[in-house]
């Protein structure tokens, strides 16, 4: 399973790259707003850092506007993937952009049927939002399981990109279900490496090491 980092913070991207845990990047307007920077400046910098897929989200909600923004962002680098919402207008844009050779990530997916439509339209990625479904007492990972099964049933090439990841269990379940990608906040990436028994074991090893006779310097 590929790890994308869900951020527009260049510092976090650099840290994930140093760990070998950044196969790609996903951004959205909310993440960009947190940086206090203009999106195009951020996108240009990320393109210079990351060789893998970089999702750049359109803010237009109409077909023509999505095409205009998508075509513009696609010029920033061959690794740029245009991110569009799962609406009827968005699906129209997916079909057109895909036919033009542009990769598309369909976002804000909350049902397997929506994911089926995105695959039929030719999406490169589908982004089911598991955390937001969990927030309303629905099962986000059950949605992912259904999407993976549907895509396997019919041989769709659209990759399942699990989004709205809130904690390590989401990453674990995505991997068990066979999702192609999980896009993960840097804070969750750090949590993945932590375990209380690892900390306890390291503490004991270091304490025991202090008891070992040392050669004089």
UniProtKB/Swiss-Prot annotation:
The active site is at residue 83. GO terms for molecular function: aldehyde-lyase activity; transaldolase activity. Its EC number is 2.2.1.2. InterPro entries: Aldolase_TIM (IPR013785), TAL/FSA (IPR001585), Transaldolase_3B (IPR022999), Transaldolase_3B/F6P_aldolase (IPR004731), Transaldolase_AS (IPR018225), TSA/FSA_arc/bac (IPR033919). It comes from the Bacteria. Transaldolase is important for the balance of metabolites in the pentose-phosphate pathway. The keyword Iron does not apply. The keyword Cytoplasm applies. It comes from Anaeromyxobacter dehalogenans (strain 2CP-1 / ATCC BAA-258). GO terms for cellular component: cytoplasm. It holds the Pfam family TAL_FSA. Pathway: Carbohydrate degradation; pentose phosphate pathway; D-glyceraldehyde 3-phosphate and beta-D-fructose 6-phosphate from D-ribose 5-phosphate and D-xylulose 5-phosphate (non-oxidative stage): step 2/3. This is Probable transaldolase. It catalyses: D-sedoheptulose 7-phosphate + D-glyceraldehyde 3-phosphate = D-erythrose 4-phosphate + beta-D-fructose 6-phosphate. GO terms for biological process: carbohydrate metabolic process; pentose-phosphate shunt. Gene3D superfamilies: Aldolase class I. It is found in: Cytoplasm. Belongs to the transaldolase family. Type 3B subfamily. Keywords: Cytoplasm, Pentose shunt, Schiff base, Transferase.
